[in-house]
Structures are given as structure tokens and as C-alpha cells.
Swiss-Prot record:
Keywords: Cobalamin biosynthesis, Glutamine amidotransferase. The gene is cobQ. The active site is at C333, H431. It comes from the Bacteria. It comes from Pseudomonas aeruginosa (strain LESB58). This is Cobyric acid synthase.
Length: 490
């Protein structure tokens, strides 16, 4: 299968080298030029996911890249999504739908089937768009993963596309990363690499130039540009929790998020991290929950196991103390399920079959079922009747008298979530609550912030995507990039 000139792939020398960011930047740059461009990631492993318009599930990075292309997210943009649910196993999602869970060894054998889904999705996108901008995963030089590879060079070879290799200079060793990666590739794979992008550079570019000259002479491949380090660029993290915060002055609301072993969709908290009046703290193992105005129990891929971890760390008692002193508590998705009285997993969907006691803070019980609920929704928060948009990704069905006091009333007539009688505890299945300006402001007032500054998170994300495209224009060889995309340089 040949699609050279219409498909361009970005691979990285390491995880977090800048692949997602570079693909986002290139997508918006091409879209601004009027090119019909679409993002694509063959295989993604992440617990941060988004719901598509066609009712499926893809990695959140591809949803952001879709926004960069000015497109609605679609399952073809990320045909294989792996969501880890144990240290050695993951739920396998094909074309937006969960098909099974398996351990790493079983998935290695399954990759041939997964590759069929990957190539089918790519074929549809390549037929519909002028440029398919592809993001690799991790590094193409992982020797133990080379067999049956579908995420990096295995895919590039299958569709016969050129590759850009990106490396992060800020972590050090950039020349070793680039040259070493090339050395570990096969001859045909090495030939496929058409140039390098160096990411996160700080300082005087003139001091770097001798190294760039050496790299080009050593490899025979061009450096397509050097992107600067941008400290205040805030796009949603693909997997690792982003703990950076915007500069803040004045009184702030203290919000604490316990980081559980299988935390999912922690991008829910990005709007709080960037809010000028919020001091957001992620608390990990071995740490006590600090005093706070609001504690938020996040989503979880393994709710019963994470509930056990919460108890082992003594956080359940800390949460009860927090409530006794007048603090507020919010549970999102799996966090909502933890707030109830019982959690049942009769099918063993998230581990061993069985039931667990919840925190008992809402009169609810949840039963996990095989069918996952995947919806983009609109509605109104019960607090202040604030309008909101969000999305559901969950396998649980929750019942109980607390549902008579819903947290959200959806436009489709359904009620979602619950509130406690005293109003101090609230839970909802909806992710993305804080991205809606009015709902975020209402929740912050509920948690104790009297005068709330309205922040348009969607506008902030759009601004940063535009900034990325500006960086492409200023710092990369756009002529060569257009040639790699099969586009005229005009």
C-alpha cells in the first residue's frame, strides 16, 4: 500500500519527546493553509480518553489534534486504544469499542488483528483527506517490541510513508537519542526518516549550530528545525499528570485530588490547574491529604482496586475529617461510584469478581456491566442552573435514593449523579465539568470561593493551538515539510 506524499508520520526518540505537540502544531499549520488534514495515531496506550461524535472512544491527544484540524473527533483517528487496568493487562478498544481485556503477551499475538483495524482506518482517512498526520508511540527503537509493530515503523512500512524524528533536548543527550535511534533501525526504516526536529531548546541557537551541522553530516539527514522551550503552553497531557500551574496571586481556593493507581481522565483537572484563583494539589502515595476547601475523587479504570488503595493510604478517614470541618467533596465517574454504599463487579470486568463497600457518603449502589456508556452530553448543573457540556465513559449502572437529588439534569431528560442531603457531597458521571465556564464558576462558588473570575478554558486551548502553529511558521523548514506532505510550496 503506497500513500507517500499524503501521509506523514512523527515518531519520537523517547516517550514525551513532543510527538503529540508537534502533530498538533503541524495539523493547525496545515489547516490554516487550507489543507484538508486529519490526525491519526495507530495505537495509543492511555487512560485519558475522549468520546467521539459517532459514540466511540479515542485518546484525548487525538481529540485535541482533531480540534487543531478543525474537525470533530472520530474513531478512525485512533483505531486502537489500550487502557491499562492492571500492571500487566489492559482493556483493548478497537474502532472506539471495548472488545476484550488481555495481558501483554496475549496482546502481542493479537497485534495482527489490531493491524487490520489500523490499516482500515488509515485507508478511510487517506481517501477523505489530503494529508494524514500520524503520531507514533514511544520510540521506534524498542527492540523487544519490534515484532508485529503497529505503532511506529511497522505502520510506516505498511503504508510506505515518510517519518520525522523528534527529540527533546531539554532532558539532555539529544544527539545520542537521535543517532542511537537511527542505529537501531533497519536499513529500510532508516531510509524512511526524512529529517529531525529538536524540541524544547533554551538558549542561543548559535551555540547549538555546530551540533546540528555534525548531526546532518553524521546521518545525511536534515534538521528540519529547532522548537523553543515554551513554559506556559498548556495542552492536555496524553498520559502523565501535568502538575504545572499558571502564575497566581491573591486568595485561592484549595483543591486536592488523591492520585489513585488507576486514575483516568485526569485532564478533567486542567481547567483548575490553569485557573488563577485555584491552588490545585495532586496527592500521591505516602502523602497525607492536606487541608482543602474541595477534595475531588477522580475517575478510575479499576474502581474497587482504587477504593482499596484509598483506604490503605488512610485517605478515607482524611475525607471524613474534611467533611466534618465543613469541606466539600466531589466525585467524578469512578469517584461517584466510590461515594456510594456498595460497588458490585459480578462479571469481573475490573479484576476479580465481587463486591466492595463504598465510602457510604451517598445512598447509592453501583453494578458494573459489560456495556460501556459513551456519550457527549449537554445539560445544566443543579448548582445555579449553570449550563454545561461533558462526556460519559463508564460501565457502571448506579441506583439509589440519592439519585432523587441529581447533580446534573441533562438536555435529553436524564438526571445524572447525586447530592447529599446537607449539600456538602456531590457526584456525577460527567467528565469535562470544569471546561464549561459557567459550571466551573458555580462549582468553585459551591466550594467556597466568593468572587469567581470566569475563565474560558476552550479559548485558552484554542489560543495555545494557534501558538503552536506560529512556532511551526517561525522555527521549522516549512518548504521541506510541505514537500513531505505532497503540498505545493506557495
Amino acid at each position: 500500500m503506497s500513500d507517500r506524499g499524503r501521509t506523514l508520520m512523527v515518531q519520537g526518540t523517547t516517550s514525551d519527546a513532543g510527538k503529540s505537540t508537534l502533530v498538533t502544531a503541524l495539523c493547525r499549520w496545515l489547516a490554516r493553509r487550507g489543507v484538508a488534514v486529519v490526525p491519526f495515531k495507530p495505537q495509543n496506550m492511555a487512560l485519558n480518553s475522549a468520546v467521539t461524535a459517532d459514540g466511540g472512544e479515542i485518546g484525548r491527544a487525538q481529540a485535541v489534534q482533531a480540534q487543531a484540524c478543525r474537525l470533530a473527533p472520530h474513531t478512525d483517528m485512533n483505531p486502537v486504544l489500550l487502557k491499562p487496568n492492571t500492571d500487566i493487562g489492559a482493556q483493548v478498544i478497537i474502532h472506539g469499542r471495548a472488545v476484550t481485556s488481555m495481558d501483554a503477551a496475549a496482546y502481542h499475538d493479537y497485534k495482527r488483528v489490531a493491524m487490520e483495524a489500523v490499516l482500515a482506518s488509515h485507508g478511510r482517512l487517506a481517501a477523505a483527506y489530503r494529508v494524514v498526520m500520524v503520531e507514533g508511540a514511544g520510540s521506534p527503537a524498542e527492540i523487544n517490541l519490534r515484532a508485529n509493530d503497529i505503532a511506529n515503523m511497522g505502520f510506516a512500512e505498511a503504508v510506505d510513508c515518510p517519518v520525522i524524528l523528534v527529540a527533546d533536548i531539554d532532558r539532555g543527550g539529544v544527539f545520542a537519542h537521535l543517532v542511537g535511534t537511527l542505529e537501531l533501525l533497519s536499513d529500510s526504516e532508516r531510509e524512511r526518516v526524512r529529517g529531525f526536529v529538536i524540541n524544547r531548546f533554551r538558549g542561543d541557537i548559535a551555540l547549538l549550530q555546530p551540533g546540528l551541522d555534525w548531526l546532518e553530516a553524521r546521518t545525511g539527514k536534515p534538521v528540519l528545525g529547532v522548537l523553543p522551550y515554551v513554559s506556559d503552553l498548556h495542552l492536555e497531557a496524553e498520559d502523565a499528570i501535568d502538575t504545572r500551574q499558571a502564575a497566581k496571586v491573591g486568595p485561592r481556593l484549595k483543591v486536592v485530588v488523591p492520585v489513585l493507581p488507576r486514575i483516568s481522565n485526569h485532564t478533567d483537572f486542567d481547567p483548575l490547574r490553569l485557573h488563577p484563583q485555584v491552588e490545585l494539589s495532586f496527592v500521591g502515595p505516602g502523602q497525607a491529604l492536606p487541608s482543602a476547601d474541595l477534595i475531588v475523587l477522580p475517575g478510575s479504570k479499576s474502581v474497587r482496586a482504587d477504593l482499596a488503595a484509598l483506604r490503605e493510604r488512610g485517605w478515607d478517614e482524611a475525607i471524613l475529617r474534611h467533611l466534618r470541618y465543613g469541606g466539600r467533596l466531589l466525585g467524578i465517574c469512578g469517584g461517584l461510584q466510590m461515594l456510594g454504599e456498595r460497588l458490585h463487579d459480578p462479571l469481573g470486568l475490573e479484576g476479580a469478581a465481587g463486591s466492595s463497600a463504598g465510602l457510604g457518603l451517598l445512598a447509592l449502589e453501583t453494578t458494573l456491566e459489560a456495556d460501556k456508556q459513551l456519550r457527549n452530553v449537554q445539560g445544566r448543573l443543579s448548582l445555579e442552573d449553570a449550563p454545561l457540556s461533558g462526556y460519559e465513559i463508564h460501565a457502571g449502572v448506579t441506583r439509589g435514593e440519592a439519585l432523587a437529588r441529581p447533580a446534573v439534569v441533562l438536555d435529553d431528560g436524564r438526571a445524572d449523579g447525586a447530592r447529599s442531603v446537607d449539600g456538602n457531597v456531590m457526584g456525577t458521571y460527567l467528565h469535562g465539568l470544569f471546561e464549561s465556564t459557567a459550571a466551573c464558576s458555580a462549582l468553585l462558588r459551591w466550594a467556597g470561593l466568593r468572587e469567581v473570575q470566569a475563565v474560558d478554558y476552550q479559548a485558552l486551548r484554542e489560543r495555545d493551538i494557534e501558538r503552536l502553529a506560529d512556532l511551526v511558521e517561525r522555527h521549522l523548514d516549512t518548504g521541506r515539510l510541505l514537500a513531505l506532505c505532497g503540498e505545493p510550496h506557495a
